[in-house]
Design a protein with these regions (language model features):
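Cell-envelope/extracellular polymer assembly enzymes that use nucleotide-activated donors
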Residues: 2-4
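Short, well-formed alpha-helical segments that are part of the catalytic scaffolds
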Residues: 9-26
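Acidic helix N-cap motif at the loop->helix transition within catalytic regions
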Residues: 16-17, 39-48, 98
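A conserved acidic beta->alpha catalytic loop
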Residues: 34-45, 63, 93-94
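Glycine-rich, basic loop-to-helix element that forms the pyrophosphate-binding segment
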Residues: 61-78
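Short beta-strand-to-loop acidic/aromatic patch adjacent to the donor-nucleotide binding site
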Residues: 83-92
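Acidic donor-binding/catalytic loop of UDP-sugar-dependent glycosyltransferases
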Residues: 93-106
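A short, conserved acidic/glycine-rich loop-to-beta-strand motif
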Residues: 109
Length: 109
């Protein structure tokens, strides 16, 4: 299984990075699609995500085109890069304890 995650961001705060840390190690790659208008964007401190080096793709177009547009971009990227599964997440999504590992076992079985 090759797993791409996508998180759709809209005015993200620092909690997003903590949420990402709960599942990033289990993903092959993670696309962060920012729907925040370009004039309001701020950089997230992704350097603290040790499991993210080379795994995080930052994207967006500087305007809010909605969830569908971001998901379409993720699907196109997944197909072009040999991913077998796509995990869609909201910026508030997080996993506690070993919940994500249990989730992956369920998908594989």
């Amino acid at each position: 299984m090759k797993l791409l995650g996508i998180v759709i961001l809209y005015y993200p705060d620092d909690a997003v990075v903590k949420n990402i840390a709960t599942y990033l190690a289990q993903l092959d790659e993670l696309m962060l699609w920012d729907n925040t208008p370009a004039t309001d964007r701020r950089d997230l401190d992704l350097d603290s995500l040790e499991d993210g080096r080379g795994k995080i793709i930052l994207d967006g177009c500087g305007e809010n085109l909605g969830i569908g547009s971001a998901l379409n971009k993720a699907v196109a990227y997944a197909r072009a890069n040999g991913f077998t599964h796509l995990l869609t997440l909201d910026q508030d999504s997080c996993f506690g304890g070993r919940n994500f590992e249990s989730y992956l076992r369920a998908i594989r079985s």
